Every structure is written in structure tokens, then in C-alpha cells.
A protein has these predicted regions:
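Short aromatic/hydrophobic "clamp" motif used to bind/position activated sugar donors
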Residues: 81
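Glycine-rich, basic loop-to-helix element that forms the pyrophosphate-binding segment
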Residues: 59-76, 86, 97
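Short, acidic, metal-binding catalytic loop of nucleotide-sugar glycosyltransferases
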Residues: 20-29
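A short, conserved alpha-helix in the catalytic core of glycosyltransferases
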Residues: 158-217
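Active-site-adjacent helix/loop segment of glycosyltransferases
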Residues: 204-309
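A recurrent flexible, glycine/aromatic-enriched loop bordering the glycosyltransferase active site
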Residues: 126, 132, 136-142, 147-176, ...
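Conserved donor NDP-sugar-binding/catalytic core segment of glycosyltransferases
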Residues: 88-139
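Single conserved hydrophobic/aromatic residue that forms the stacking wall/gate
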Residues: 317-336
Length: 336
């Protein structure tokens, strides 16, 4: 069985379209779990009335994407879990290719579909594309999207491949491995928690794949606006939290210092543009990291217990010397 877990906070209209699409899925053995993160609208009442066949988990507060998914996983009956954003719709045949790919190799622990833009359906989605990668300074990008540039889907990525991370927009994982890796780290709340999870999977010697035969469409930035203070804060904080928490100590300190300098440059650049949401997001991220060393250290200890693969053996992207200045400048000035 496949358990489809949808964390949700407000927006009945968004969730309604997602559920109507899901129920057209051409795959018989699945269940739908909606985890309500203490919505303040009529989401819970609507689900109980119009979708009584769905498993509903009601949280006492908003635990974010990470916490919502973890609580959904606890009640899941399937051997495979699919974590799915509520602002997605799915191709009718989206689920079977993911299951087939997962069944093909016991070392595959997570897999994502091809994720396209909901509003312009020949365009790769910002949040997922066809599989995520990350450079050594923890700047993430995807096949189909480099920073702010999204490619048109012309079939150029229609081959299933390994990747560094699967997008939390729509990702399938093995339930037993998810539990072994301790699930999503709830410190993240939202944004990059799936990258952190996939990093742990890699450290355990497991593989992440992208399966473009499966297609999902994503609206993006419905629950949190693209240029909001909170989004900036979580992106900047969580990238540095991963870097400091997951690398070996000396490498974390070395790369952490370089990333800190780049963050300062990004902050100054945002000041020049009078982009105060971005400025305050970066400063708030620094503030959190400065005053939570214990939580960072505890994260390092948890990661170390799982590690079977050294840093040098991880499939992180190393940018070549000739293109590095251009790449770094683009990463800093376009960082969202």
C-alpha cells in the first residue's frame, strides 16, 4: 500500500482541487492522509463532511511541513509514503511509475516525479523540476531550474536518474527507512527539510531517484509567498543549519565561514535594493544560528549516528574553477 500524506494549513479551495485530482489516480492500493496544522478556516469541517473516506490528523498547532509529515507518517499503513503539497494536481497515472521504480531496487529509498508549473505546464516547477542537486556550499538547484531560471520541458530530462534530493512537493520514500533516518527534522519547520532528509539517506548509503514518467503539477508559493520575510528567513537559516549540522566538523567550519561571508554580501546587496524582507530574513537567520549552538550540536550527533558514507563520497556538485566566480555571484544575488 501507498500512503499519500498531505500537510495542510488553511485554503479549502486549494486542498479541494488536490483531492479531486488524487481521487482520479489510476492505482488501486493507496490511502490519503490529510494532516491539518491547526487551520483557522473551515478546512477540518469540510474534510469531515465532504471527504469522510480520508484519514484526518488534527494537530493542536502548526508544526509546519516537517512536523505535519512526521505526524502523518505515524498513522500511515503503507510500506511506501508519498509526501505531497496541497497545491498540486497529479496526472492520472502518476503513482504507478513511482512504485515500479521503487520496487526495481531495494537500495532506492526516495523518488520524485517530474514536477511542472501548474500555470504554465510546459515549464519546470521552481521547487522540484526533475530531481534536485546541491553544491558544496548548500545552494540547491534542480534539473530544469538553476536559481531563478526555469527551463521549458522539451523532454531533455525524460530519463530516470539518480539525484541528490527529491522535492518535498511530491516525494515517495520507504517507510522503514524514513523511520530509521528519524523522519524530517522539525527544527526546519518548512523549506529544505527534504534536502536534509535526503542528505541523511545518502549518508546511510541509500539512493535517491527522479522518475519523469510520473508527472505532478505545482502552483508554488501558495502557503507562503515567494518574497515573504518568513520564506527568506527559513531558506537562509535552513541552508546554513544543514551545512553546519551535516558536514564533518572541520569541513563544516571551513565551508560555514565561506557561506557566512556570502550571506553578508547578500544582505548588503538586499539593503542596496531596499529589500527589507530579505535583509531581515538574513539577519534573523544569523540570530537564530548564533543563539542555538546546542540544537546544531545535537543535530550533528544525530547525523553522526547514521553516517556510513564520508563527505567526499557524497554526490554534491563541485563547481569548476573557470565558472566558479559567475556561479557564486549568481547564487548570492539571486538567492531566495
Amino acid at each position: 500500500m501507498v500512503s499519500i500524506i498531505i500537510p495542510h494549513w488553511n485554503g479549502v479551495d486549494v486542498l479541494s482541487e488536490c483531492l479531486e485530482s488524487l481521487k482520479k489516480t489510476r492505482y488501486s492500493d493507496y490511502e490519503i492522509i490529510v494532516v491539518d496544522n491547526a487551520s483557522t478556516d473551515n478546512s477540518v469541517e469540510w474534510i469531515k463532511k465532504d471527504h469522510s473516506d480520508i484519514i484526518l490528523v488534527q494537530n493542536d498547532k502548526n508544526y509546519g511541513y516537517a512536523g505535519g509529515c512526521n505526524r502523518g507518517a505515524k498513522v500511515a499503513n503503507g510500506d511506501y509514503l508519498v509526501f505531497l503539497n496541497n497545491d498540486t494536481i497529479q496526472d492520472q497515472d502518476w503513482l504507478a511509475p513511482l512504485v515500479r521504480r521503487m520496487n526495481s531496487d531495494s537500495n532506492i529509498v526516495a523518488i520524485q516525479p517530474k514536477i511542472l508549473n501548474y500555470f504554465q505546464r510546459d515549464l519546470f516547477d521552481y521547487a522540484g523540476g526533475t530531481g534536485g542537486h546541491m553544491d558544496i556550499l548548500c545552494f540547491p538547484f534542480t534539473r530544469g531550474r538553476m536559481f531563478l531560471n526555469q527551463e521549458v520541458d522539451k523532454g531533455q530530462y525524460d530519463t530516470a536518474e539518480t539525484c541528490f534530493w527529491a522535492s518535498g512537493t511530491a516525494m515517495m520514500v520507504r517507510k522503514d527507512s524514513f523511520k530509521m533516518a528519524n523522519g524530517f527534522d522539525e527544527i526546519f519547520f518548512a523549506h529544505m527539510e527534504e534536502i536534509d532528509l535526503c542528505w541523511r539517506f545518502h549518508a546511510m548509503g541509500l539512493d535517491i531517484w527522479s522518475e519523469p514518467e510520473s508527472v505532478v503539477f505545482h502552483k508554488n508559493a501558495v502557503s507562503m509567498p515567494m518574497y515573504s520575510h518568513q520564506k527568506y528567513y527559513l531558506n537562509h537559516r535552513n541552508a546554513q543549519l544543514m551545512l553546519l549540522g551535516n558536514y564533518s566538523l572541520l569541513l563544516a567550519l571551513y565551508l560555514g565561514f565561506i557561506r557566512f561571508i556570502l550571506e553578508l554580501i547578500a544582505c548588503v546587496y538586499a539593503m542596496v535594493k531596499l529589500d527589507w524582507n530579505h535583509v531581515t530574513g538574513i539577519i534573523r537567520a544569523f540570530w537564530w544560528l548564533l543563539f542555538h549552538p546546542h540544537q546544531i550540536w545535537q543535530k550533528r550527533k544525530r547525523f553522526k549516528k547514521l553516517r556510513e558514507v564520508k563527505d567526499n563520497d557524497l554526490s554534491l556538485i563541485h563547481i569548476s574553477e573557470p565558472t566558479r566566480p559567475l556561479y557564486i555571484s549568481y547564487a548570492v544575488f539571486c538567492l531566495k
